[in-house]
Amino acid sequence: MRISLTKPLFAWDCLDDSPDLATIRDFLHALPDGPLLESLRRCRGKGRDDYPVTALWGVVVLTPLLRHITVEACLAELRRNAGLRQLIGIEHKDLVPKKWNLSRFQAVLGSQPHRTLLAEMFNVMVQRLGGTVKDLGRRTAGDATGLSARPQRSTKPGQDALDQPTGGKKEYTDDEGKVTKVVEWFGYKLHLLVDVDHEVALAYRITSANRGDCEVLPELVRQARGNLGDDLDRQPPVSRIETLAYDKAADAEDVHELLHESDIKPLVEMRSLWKGEHERMLPGHDGNSNVVYDEAGTIYCYDRVSDPPVRRAMSYIGHEKSRGTLKYRCPACHQGFRCPSGQRCNAGKSYGMTVRVKREIDLRRFPPIPRATKTFERGYKGRTSVERVNARTKIFWGIDDGNVTGAERFHANVGVVMLVHIGLATLLASCPRRDGTLGQTRLSPIAEALRAKIDG
């Protein structure tokens, strides 16, 4: 790969459509697949070894890496490309496995304990990146996407109790609650937690298509925090993750309590649940203070001297973490305009009226970053990074092609695609950069540290 020095650390637009042999060799070298291959060899035992485990594993990895739509296309390329065969230990074209060999191998790869070892490889590679790239995981975002899959024709006794593909449905509504779009699919859901700035997945889960996002998000947060080196038992909690952006699917009290306990600021869009109400009186205030809040948690004050009364949003000053409160100030004093009710509200107060809202009243409604602030709007826009990662897994590496039959094969295929994603992220971060058109390539300190970890 040829990457300019001015490109970002993870320059996803510089990925080759067809990786060369040097890139493939570096990718295979970066995979910590020793425990998985040893487990597969023990599983095979003294059975026939016509096609070694390393060769079958190499074909499974090369299929998404080389962007082949089917396994047969990858096998055809191996038969005509001697250099590619040698990278995965196949000496002659007659020794290239058949497609039915790969089908059985994928079923074994997706069963226990190999499925757990496959996921552990992903975790190890994220931990490797997290230990080298210090800002990885500071700003995160999550989302779930539907994946097409085919059901298994028959289930044998003793097989893993994996969820079979089911029908999924997602409805999109407008501001009035009317359904504007319906998306249906048959298969699974892929839940991702992604770094916003680098577009690198930190955690993933595969679930049934009808499982809610808020049910899976706690597992994603714990997995991501573990991969980033957080001490999950430390009190008070210290998390490397500063913010987490998600859509309305994660707007649940349990999720907000978990993020509060993990010291993570939620950037979660709020569901509309109030029926016939537009505002409520803030607890601890009576009608004389003129302070109310709406469903999104925005604090307002009323100028009741004017006719008709005027409602204004109070000026947000900041989050007082030690007090567990959000501080607001009189908008007239803060913004410098005259309010007819100023003399009554701010009598004897040079700074003006201040209101402190205790977050414990409702963690869901009063997050550390209020929804009516520019900071929330900018942070929430980072959620599009998950959509770009989802697009790469589907368009680049065919995770949504629907060519895999059976739950075990599907889980194995998704696990391999996620390894390709995190493996290419490792190559992008460790790749030498070119200084100018005719300049020499050089390694950054991050690339040198990452290569040392891979070689060590």
Language-model features: locations:
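Short, positively charged, Gly/Tyr-enriched micro-motifs
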Residues: 49-120, 408-411
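Long, low-complexity, polar/charged, intrinsically disordered or flexibly structured peripheral segments
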Residues: 324-368
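Basic, short loop/linker segments at the boundary and entry of helix-turn-helix/winged-helix-like folds
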Residues: 17, 21-66, 101
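Basic, amphipathic alpha-helical segments enriched in Lys/Arg and hydrophobic/aromatic residues
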Residues: 374-456
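Short amphipathic alpha-helical "interface-anchor" segments enriched in bulky aromatics
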Residues: 79, 280-323, 359-407
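Short gly/pro/ser/thr-enriched loop/turn and capping motifs at secondary-structure boundaries
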Residues: 273-278
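Polybasic low-complexity intrinsically disordered regions
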Residues: 76, 99-271
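Charged, often Cys/His-bearing segments associated with DNA-binding zinc-finger transcription factors
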Residues: 1-39, 339, 429-456
